[in-house]
């Protein structure tokens, strides 16, 4: 059986990029042995736990936003390809509105439209800003997932539908047993790319008061009050987002090659 050469892409990366490995190793050695001599690096080490907690907040928001957006997007995408116009029209309106709305506007909208507390029975439950940001990011995520889902369905050759109908399969059986398994493989690369974009979009959360990585970096910069530290800490913020999103991008490229002719 032939083996797809693209499957070995992640394993062959170190052999094809020795220069990058040397550069990363040199940078790591500089941080380990040279950083403690500098007060700027010492301050960065002191703030590192707080930065890690803040970045954890960004990751939590991104995971919840893509989860909610994916579930809602699959439902909207299924409605968008429905033969009934009464269900297809609202789904397409949703997709067009939230795909073309600025994310910052949606975040401000959800922040100020939803209350600070929810009254359930005799209890008041806090409705924190980070949850509102999650909803604000889940809305465009759902529209993009719906469009990805619709595009994946449209990429399935029509001959498969015709062959299935000739075997007396119902539309529901064709959809569940034949179309959906192929769709999910085709959806995976763009879905992962969308998640990386959502993760970078969580940087907007600090604008509405969420204590995330950006907000922590701002507090640290104002507290230490050194120009070199300000440059270093925002470079560290950039490095954290890059270190989290770049592997997702590489895996996405690998999956695109893997399923290119599936």
Where are these regions (language model features)?
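Transmembrane alpha-helices and adjacent helix-loop boundaries
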Residues: 1-262
